[in-house]
A protein has these predicted regions:
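A structural signal for well-ordered alpha-helices, especially hydrophobic packing surfaces
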Residues: 35, 63, 67, 83, ...
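Alpha-helical oligomerization interfaces
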Residues: 50, 54-61, 74, 78, ...
Length: 143
């Protein structure tokens, strides 16, 4: 039996780039449902409620990072910055250790999934240059 949070084995199917935000958002909804008492499917055991809430928060952070950044590498950087901030905030009354464990696990899994998607995509230097030029035009035209 495994617990409710999915483990991302290396042989797991790749999540396409356009499905990543939805993938993380659905995982967040699932974990929040488990935290609120939804019966899990057969073969899945529930863990501590705070752990499920932490998992939900981590997946939601990943979904927000993916929706707010065009480049996957920027989303990964944002998630890593969130992790370092959490490490510096050691207040157990705000972030109980089961919540922290769930959050760390969810963000690490999301980062692994994003990196696997990035590694599977062929590098297209022309596309990267177009994105850079578009971003530069947007920044130059900003008031």
């Amino acid at each position: 039996m495994n617990d409710a949070g999915p483990d991302a084995p290396q042989d797991a199917p790749l999540v396409p780039r356009f499905k990543l935000p939805e993938h993380c958002a659905l995982a967040a909804v699932r974990e929040e449902a488990f935290a609120n008492g939804t019966t899990p499917p057969p073969g899945v055991t529930l863990v501590d409620v705070d752990t499920h809430r932490g998992l939900a928060a981590g997946y939601e952070a990943a979904a927000v990072a993916l929706r707010s950044h065009r480049r996957l590498s920027d989303a990964v950087d944002m998630l890593r910055r969130l992790m370092s901030r959490l490490e510096h905030r050691a207040d157990e009354t705000i972030y109980p250790s089961p919540w922290r464990a769930g959050y760390v696990r969810a963000v690490n899994e999301a980062v692994t999934t994003i990196e696997r998607t990035l590694a599977a995509e062929p590098f297209d230097p022309a596309r990267e240059r177009r994105l850079e030029r578009r971003v530069m035009r947007i920044e130059m035209n900003a008031p």
